[in-house]
Amino acid sequence: MAKKTKRALAIREKLEAGKVYTALEALQLLKEMPAAKFVESVDVAINLGVDPRKSDQVVRGAAVLPHGTGKTVRVAVFAQNDNADAAKAAGADIVGMEELADEIKAGRSDFDVVIAEPAAMRVVGQLGQILGPRGLMPNPKVGTVTADIKAAVENAKAGQVRFRADKSGIVHAMIGKIDFDAEKLLENLHALIAEINKLRPTTIKGVYMQKAYISTTMGPGIAVDVASLTNA
């Protein structure tokens, strides 16, 4: 407990109370903070001016980060024939149809992303109660139900992050690991923000991106100037 307290105090000393940092300043500051005993993820939380209870204000999508997430992603694909071959060639870890569905029903869970060709949804649809709670149910809005299986697998392997505003209108996403250069983390952040901006609902009034915070897995959230989130 003493070590945790010492680290927490050291982190607190580096933060200026009430200060709002630029995105790059926040990322550089995170890298200067005392390290945890593992390579922490760098995460962003963005408060959006949306009401997710309204169907036309649901913000959900995916972004391919130029420098990846630093995480090895295992991809399962539901496809047949040419699409199954394309999935394997693109690096999918698991490819199948009914037999894969049976394995998942029996408890198989060694995958991080599930992708399906449209025709496979008749099979995948049976897995809603298993994949849904884990956030793994394929969905065309995030590119995981698609005819272009090759691109979907390549994107997932390259470090695509999926996001959705929660019931409070907050988007949480990982933009890399703390051992990334600050500039690479910033470029990943810009890619994420660009996708979130594309999904701005036409029905909302007022400010879309209201507040933003950047943090590591075990660190505090650092308030970030929303204007610094884009590379415009």
UniProtKB/Swiss-Prot annotation:
Disulfide bonds: none
An MF annotation (GO) of this entry: tRNA binding
Assigned GO CC terms: cytosolic large ribosomal subunit
Statement: the UniProt record of this protein carries the keyword Cell division: no
InterPro entries: Ribosom_uL1_bac-type, Ribosomal_uL1, Ribosomal_uL1-like, Ribosomal_uL1/biogenesis, Ribosomal_uL1_3-a/b-sand, Ribosomal_uL1_CS
Gene Ontology process terms (BP): regulation of translation; translation
Annotated Pfam families: Ribosomal_L1
Keyword tags: Repressor, Ribonucleoprotein, Ribosomal protein, RNA-binding, rRNA-binding, Translation regulation, tRNA-binding
Known role: Binds directly to 23S rRNA. The L1 stalk is quite mobile in the ribosome, and is involved in E site tRNA release. Protein L1 is also a translational repressor protein, it controls the translation of the L11 operon by binding to its mRNA.
Subunit text: Part of the 50S ribosomal subunit.
Similarity annotation: Belongs to the universal ribosomal protein uL1 family.
Annotated protein name in UniProt: Large ribosomal subunit protein uL1
Organism field: Dichelobacter nodosus (strain VCS1703A)
